[in-house]
Regions:
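N-terminal secretory signal peptides that target proteins for export/translocation
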Residues: 1-6
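Residues marking helix boundaries in flexible regions
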Residues: 8-11, 28
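Extracytoplasmic metal-acquisition and chelation regions
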Residues: 24-330
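Bacterial N-terminal signal peptides
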Residues: 10-23
Length: 330
């Protein structure tokens, strides 16, 4: 009798598994196929769409080094929705995007931001040269580093999902509202952490000069070894930055996850050789969220595979290294 019940139970489980195996492809197929160029856009789509979407990110955590692959073109062509940054990051993709099938809905999220809110790349690195974007302007593409700008983008992504999937409009709206509440808390967190740093110490020197929007929003002056487009630096710029760091009496510089740490080590060594003590800290996450399989040394409590966690990690890293210790007598 016991054996009979056991066998019946096994059969039920087996049948259930077979049914699930048959239904699963249909469930996955029913989801919106969304391709996002950056990991930050992909994370935001996932936060709004949840199980209604299947999201693929193309560029990884360092979009400046991205090179398009054949499989990327296939995913783009098969997508219901393609969302991209729009400001120079995807220069290598523009031709491909223009040739996608007409039934692929394509969204440039930078279009939702007033041009007056976009930073000219020259405002932060006049000493670098820049390739022009398709409009002939030189906009800094790292607007996600100002949380208030990214909250505008959240609404744009919500609208885009509703255009493609109007039956789930209420779901996307409620998810968007919830996520915006989380981002409002994030913005307040960054402000409160930044205010703990003395005003005269709020100077961020990074390997890639990507923190212009962050600095404007949260009260920091910024500079970098490489420009906003991630182009290589020059000996002249390394010398300029060395003397600026010494003149400002800065004691910490930062490396970020889009460039090799070696470039900032070279800057640090140049400054140390001149008799000025400066430490190297990081990484600051500027290019995108990390893959869930990636880890950071001295990992903090934040989830670096989300936009929220990335931004919290950044401000906490800055706070730790720019706040005077008690040993300094401050």
């Amino acid at each position: 009798m016991k054996w009979s019940k056991l066998i019946r139970g096994i059969n039920v489980v087996a049948f259930s598994c077979m049914a699930l195996a048959v239904l699963l492809p249909e469930i996955v197929e029913a989801r919106l196929r969304v391709v996002a160029t950056t990991t930050i856009i992909a994370d935001t789509v996932q936060q709004i769409g949840h199980d209604k979407v299947t999201v693929r990110s193309l560029m990884g955590s360092n979009p400046h080094h991205y090179k398009i692959r054949t499989e990327d073109i296939r995913h783009l062509s098969q997508a219901h929705l393609v969302i991209y940054n729009g400001l120079s990051i995807e220069n290598g993709l523009r031709r491909v995007l223009s040739q996608l099938p007409k039934d692929v809905y394509i969204v440039d999220v930078s279009d939702c931001l007033p041009k007056k809110n976009l930073r000219s790349s020259h405002q932060f690195d006049d000493h670098h040269s820049h390739p022009e974007n398709s409009c002939g302007y030189h906009y800094d593409p790292h607007f996600w580093l100002n949380v208030n700008h990214w909250m505008v983008v959240v609404r744009q992504i919500e609208k885009s999902l509703k255009v493609i999937d109007s039956n789930q409009a209420h779901f996307y709206h409620m998810s968007s509202n919830k996520y915006l509440g989380q981002l409002n808390e994030l913005d307040q967190y960054i402000r409160s952490q930044s205010e703990k740093i003395p005003t005269n110490l709020r100077f961020l020197v990074t390997s890639h000069n990507a923190l212009g929007y962050f600095g404007q929003a949260y009260g920091f002056e910024t500079d970098g070894l490489m420009g906003t487009e991630g182009e290589e630096t020059s000996i002249a710029n390394l010398r300029r930055l060395s003397y600026k760091i010494m003149d400002q009496k800065l004691t910490t510089i930062f490396w970020d996850n889009t460039t090799s740490r070696k470039s900032m080590q070279a800057l640090q060594e140049s400054i140390l050789a001149k008799g000025h003590k400066v430490s190297l800290a990081g990484p600051i996450l500027v290019g995108g969220v990390l893959d869930s399989r990636q880890t950071l040394q001295n990992c903090d409590k934040h989830n670096h595979s989300t936009y929220d966690g990335m931004m919290r990690h950044n401000v906490d890293t800055i706070l730790v290294h720019l706040t005077p210790s008690r040993d300094d007598g401050n």
